[in-house]
Amino acid sequence: MRAVVQRSLEAKVTIEGNTVGTIDHGFVVLLGVGPTDTEAESDYLAEKISKLRVFSDPVGKMNLALADVGGQVLSISQFTLYADTHRGNRPSFTGAADPALGDRLYQAFNAKLKALGVPVATGEFGGDMQVSLTNDGPVTILFDTEAK
């Protein structure tokens, strides 16, 4: 499972001109699911991201987590994180999980974050979405459960 975590001051996701998810500040998480991923990976990432200390404390050191700053997560499914660009100019996405598994683990990831007390807004799995955000820092962190 792969995740791109961007610290943001605000973010929203729209589908066909309608805003379906919005956060004030926190993380925008782009989540990709691989074919061998299980709920263990989604739980692991949710726990890591919920405890990720990249918000500034009073002396300016990255030392605070989402809960410490009242942060939220905007979670977006992103199968393109599994793009293979080694051959040709058009990426292959055969390394991504099938949609049923991807959706199930995306929902499990969001449910785990909520169970950990993190407010979560979402896009639509498989939807054609427009995501806008104001990066803070910018701070962008990459996670790949294959590397844990």
UniProtKB/Swiss-Prot annotation:
GO terms for molecular function: D-tyrosyl-tRNA(Tyr) deacylase activity; Gly-tRNA(Ala) deacylase activity; Ser(Gly)-tRNA(Ala) hydrolase activity; tRNA binding. GO terms for biological process: D-amino acid catabolic process. CDD domains: Dtyr_deacylase. Its EC number is 3.1.1.96. NCBIfam families: D-aminoacyl-tRNA deacylase. An aminoacyl-tRNA editing enzyme that deacylates mischarged D-aminoacyl-tRNAs. Also deacylates mischarged glycyl-tRNA(Ala), protecting cells against glycine mischarging by AlaRS. Acts via tRNA-based rather than protein-based catalysis; rejects L-amino acids rather than detecting D-amino acids in the active site. By recycling D-aminoacyl-tRNA to D-amino acids and free tRNA molecules, this enzyme counteracts the toxicity associated with the formation of D-aminoacyl-tRNA entities in vivo and helps enforce protein L-homochirality. This is D-aminoacyl-tRNA deacylase. It comes from Lacticaseibacillus casei (strain BL23).
